[in-house]
């Protein structure tokens, strides 16, 4: 059997790993085995939190809309507001409604008055 020389392949792999883990603390940025484990964990967390971020923003938008609706003194809740929007076929998603609630409350007042039963 002839000897196989791998050359720089492993060194290149570890260099890429070191660049990825350079911002980690302690041994997680110095030791190759712990760097590898921490990299896997970081990528798992990133993947999980991409889905979580979508849920968090939706919760934030709903909270903002609900707060403005209650501040207006309207006698119906957030879910009744959304239900009336769908019945009147107004295509405004929660993100846009939350921006309107923050930046232009009078516009949201007129929308709520239009969709009132």
Swiss-Prot record:
Where does it live in the cell?
Answer: Plastid, Chloroplast
A Pfam family it matches: Ribosomal_L20
Classification via SUPFAM superfamilies: Ribosomal protein L20
Question: What is the protein's major site of localization?
Answer: plastid
Q: Please give the superkingdom of this protein's source.
A: Eukaryota
Q: Which UniProt keywords apply?
A: Chloroplast, Plastid, Ribonucleoprotein, Ribosomal protein, RNA-binding, rRNA-binding
Under Gene Ontology molecular function, one entry of this record is: rRNA binding
Q: Which GO terms describe its biological process?
A: ribosomal large subunit assembly; translation
Q: Record's GO cellular component, any one?
A: ribonucleoprotein complex
User: What's this protein's family per the entry?
Assistant: Belongs to the bacterial ribosomal protein bL20 family.
Task: Quote the function comment for this protein.
Answer: Binds directly to 23S ribosomal RNA and is necessary for the in vitro assembly process of the 50S ribosomal subunit. It is not involved in the protein synthesizing functions of that subunit.
Q: What is this protein called?
A: Large ribosomal subunit protein bL20c
Instruction: Look up and give the organism this protein is from.
Output: Nasturtium officinale (Watercress)
